[in-house]
Every structure is written in C-alpha cells, then in structure tokens.
C-alpha cells in the first residue's frame, strides 16, 4: 500500500502515535513495531507506536515514504505519506 496516514493528539506530541488501522499493511506495522489496540467503545482497531511522530516519520522516510501533506484537525495532527 503506497499511502500511510499517521496522527497524534497535540497534547501528546511525545507519543503515542497512531500509524494505521485494522486494514493496514502488516509487514509495515511490524517494521514500525506497532501494537494493535481497540479502544473501549470503538468498533475498530488502530495500530500505535509509543514514540513521538518525529521518530515515526524518520523511520518511514528510511523505508522510502515521503510526506505528501500535513494538517491539524482540532486537537489532532495528521501526516499523509506516500511511497513510490
């Protein structure tokens, strides 16, 4: 999958970072050492890493991903990355 979205809460800029959902590439999630979690009350799962977004962005760059866009939505920061 060539696109990846990662996000974090502004008050949590030191982590954790959300790096995927239940349909994400399992190989990539393993490379990021992400844990799959389901928050009580949600009917979906997300993959998290316990590190700041900067560290995760650096890992993704080493894997060939590049940031396409970044935005803030309320208290959430979101990055979209693409791999050629």
From Swiss-Prot:
The signal sequence is: none
Q: Which InterPro entries match?
A: GFRP_sf, GTP_CycHdrlase_I_reg
Q: Which Pfam families match?
A: GFRP
Give any Gene Ontology cellular component. Answer: cytosol
Q: What does this protein do?
A: Mediates tetrahydrobiopterin inhibition of GTP cyclohydrolase 1.
Into which family does the record put it? Belongs to the GFRP family.
Matching entries from PANTHER family are given as: GTP CYCLOHYDROLASE 1 FEEDBACK REGULATORY PROTEIN
Q: What is this protein called?
A: GTP cyclohydrolase 1 feedback regulatory protein
Q: Which organism is it from?
A: Xenopus laevis (African clawed frog)
């Amino acid at each position: 999958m060539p696109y990846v979205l990662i996000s974090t809460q502004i008050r949590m800029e030191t982590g954790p970072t959300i790096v995927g959902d239940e349909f994400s590439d399992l190989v990539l999630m393993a490379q990021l050492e992400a844990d799959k979690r389901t928050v009580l009350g949600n009917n979906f799962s997300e993959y998290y890493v316990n590190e700041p977004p900067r560290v995760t962005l650096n890992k993704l760059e080493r894997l060939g991903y590049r940031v396409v866009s970044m935005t803030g939505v309320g208290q959430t920061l979101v990055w979209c990355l693409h791999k050629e």
